[in-house]
From Swiss-Prot:
Phylogenetic lineage: Eukaryota, Fungi, Dikarya, Ascomycota, Pezizomycotina
Organism: Neurospora crassa (strain ATCC 24698 / 74-OR23-1A / CBS 708.71 / DSM 1257 / FGSC 987)
Post-translational modification: Phosphorylated.
GO cellular component: cytosolic large ribosomal subunit
Cited function: Component of the ribosome, a large ribonucleoprotein complex responsible for the synthesis of proteins in the cell. The small ribosomal subunit (SSU) binds messenger RNAs (mRNAs) and translates the encoded message by selecting cognate aminoacyl-transfer RNA (tRNA) molecules. The large subunit (LSU) contains the ribosomal catalytic site termed the peptidyl transferase center (PTC), which catalyzes the formation of peptide bonds, thereby polymerizing the amino acids delivered by tRNAs into a polypeptide chain.
Assembly and binders: Component of the large ribosomal subunit (LSU). Mature N.crassa ribosomes consist of a small (40S) and a large (60S) subunit. The 40S small subunit contains 1 molecule of ribosomal RNA (18S rRNA) and at least 32 different proteins. The large 60S subunit contains 3 rRNA molecules (26S, 5.8S and 5S rRNA) and at least 42 different proteins. The acidic ribosomal P-proteins form the stalk structure of the 60S subunit. They are organized as a pentameric complex in which uL10/P0 interacts with 2 heterodimers of P1 and P2 proteins. uL10 directly interacts with 28S rRNA.
SUPFAM superfamilies according to UniProt: Ribosomal protein L10-like (SSF160369)
Protein name: Large ribosomal subunit protein uL10
Transmembrane segments: none
Main location: cytoplasm
Length: 313
């Protein structure tokens, strides 16, 4: 009993220390993960993350003990079920997640195992003798005899995802040397600084977040303006619209304040605020006319000289 109590206390201390040292946790499923595979995963995460396994009852008991001081840990409790473990990290969550999921190994089908994905048998020659045709026929696999061997004529879905693999299906897959399953750690949930979320949230880019945020703000502002219900996104639009109405009323009435006087004057005397460009062009016109007159006089002078100058050569 003393040894068990010591082990329990040691596990509690280790879990508490990891919770305090690391801000993020991957809750991972380890169904069908071998000890060798677990060792390889620990090696790949060395320096970036720490893997901790433990009995669910002990983990839940420890977390409930820590909840009094840190209520956020209660969010971990619903996910401590089945064959799970914790991966603690302070690193980039997406990079650590990819390393966790990268370690996969192919595995043969076992009778009674739940298929994690659809299992297909491809069309082609099996190299098996015709005497085993009845075995294929019993499973509904379309075959024919070609060059003295059994040939599967079309691709066939043998087992659907989520279904149990039967003894006959497992035997056939092993006969064909097909290892249809891949096993490795899966990620049940991510805990980061008090929040829990699915791992696919890590694939959302900053651009997607900004676009969604902008769309939401626009929608809220539109609804608020339509319902005449002020909200933070709509207030600026409400103020602008209200100011436009005030300006319209002030222009049509004697209401006045310093800022509106210039606007009223512009409306009453538009010519006073006309651009200086037309005036400048008007001034330029006489100057151009004078230049043309001078040019014409010069040409006439040249013609006169050319007409009589030849007589004195």
């Amino acid at each position: 009993m003393g040894g068990k109590s010591a082990n329990k206390a040691g596990y509690f201390d280790k879990l508490k220390g990891l919770l305090e040292d690391y801000r993020s946790i991957f809750i991972v499923s380890v169904d069908n993960v071998s000890s060798q595979q677990m060792h390889e995963i620990r090696q790949s995460l060395r320096g970036e993350a720490v893997v901790l396994m433990g009995k669910n009852t002990m983990v839940r008991r420890a977390l409930k003990t820590f909840v009094a001081d840190t209520p956020e840990y209660e969010r971990l409790l619903p996910f401590v079920k089945g064959n799970v473990g914790f991966v603690f990290t302070n690193g980039d969550l997406k990079e650590v997640r990819d390393k966790i999921l990268a370690n996969k190994v192919a595995a043969p089908a076992r009778a009674g195992a739940i298929a994690p994905a659809d299992v297909w048998i491809p069309a082609g020659n099996t190299g098996m003798e015709p005497g085993k045709t009845s075995f294929f026929q019993a499973l509904g696999v379309p075959t024919k005899i070609a060059r003295g061997t059994i040939e599967i004529t079309t691709d066939l879905k043998l087992v659907e995802a989520g279904a149990k693999v039967g003894p006959s299906e497992a035997t056939l897959l092993n006969m064909l040397n097909i290892s249809p399953f891949t096993y490795g750690m899966g990620i049940a949930q991510v805990y980061d600084q008090g929040n829990t979320f699915p791992s696919d949230v890590l694939d959302i880019s900053e651009e997607q977040l900004l676009k969604a945020f902008s769309t939401a703000i626009t929608t809220i502002a539109s609804l608020s303006l339509a319902l005449n219900f002020p909200t933070l996104p709509s207030v600026i639009h409400s103020v602008v619209n209200a100011y436009k109405k005030v300006l319209a009323v002030a222009i049509e009435t004697e209401i006045s304040w310093p800022e509106i006087e210039e606007l009223k004057d512009r409306i009453a005397n538009p010519e006073a605020y006309a651009s200086a460009a037309p005036a400048a062009s008007t001034e330029a016109a006489p100057a151009a006319g004078k230049a043309e007159e001078k040019e014409e006089e010069k040409e006439e002078s040249d013609e006169d000289d050319g007409g009589f100058g030849g007589l004195f050569d």
